[in-house]
Amino acid sequence: MLNPDGVIIGNFRTSYSGKDLNRQFFTADKLVYPEICALNELALQLKQQYKNRFEYYFDLHSHSTRTGLFCYGPEHQIWSGYYLRCRAFAKLLERSDEMFSYRSSIFTISEHKKTTGRAKMFSGLHIPYTYTFELSNGFYQTVGEKLVPLDEFDMLRAGRVILEGFYSFEKVHRASMTVLHTAAIGNSRRADLSRTTPLKKRSMVRPTSKA
């Protein structure tokens, strides 16, 4: 929890300083926002240590006006391979539990969210799968559009949905990467063979003409 003082004194989204912590990731003052600076430093250390293997960043929030569990995802360009993959992860979550709403999820970083943790990890550290998960303070909507009140057990359920979905997605993702890698190696070997195998010389003997 990055905002224990704000939670303890009953603030909705601000710390004891009265500022929204999730809008301070690019300009954080170490004296005023020590927790944000610490998280930025940790993320940078992990990126330096694991490089491109540091692929995921999740943060969890509550939402006062929308229903259910949904996410704000990364903003990849449509020609990027991540464009569909980051959406496939969210779609997998929806299929695993009706609490999660793919329709409510958004995969852009709007102007007023460009200083959030998600934006910092995506554009600053180039982490491809960056998500802010939002869980409603009140209800979630079933497939039949019935509103169901949320309780503390549903909060635990939401955490389980995210983690189990992440595990399932990683298995599929790794398997697909293995297949693509194997195919790429096969194509490379065939290309090497085609370059090293000599072509048969064409005969230079002219055919004799019939009398």
Segments (PLM) and residue ranges:
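Structured catalytic-domain cores with a bias toward divalent-metal coordination
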Residues: 1-211
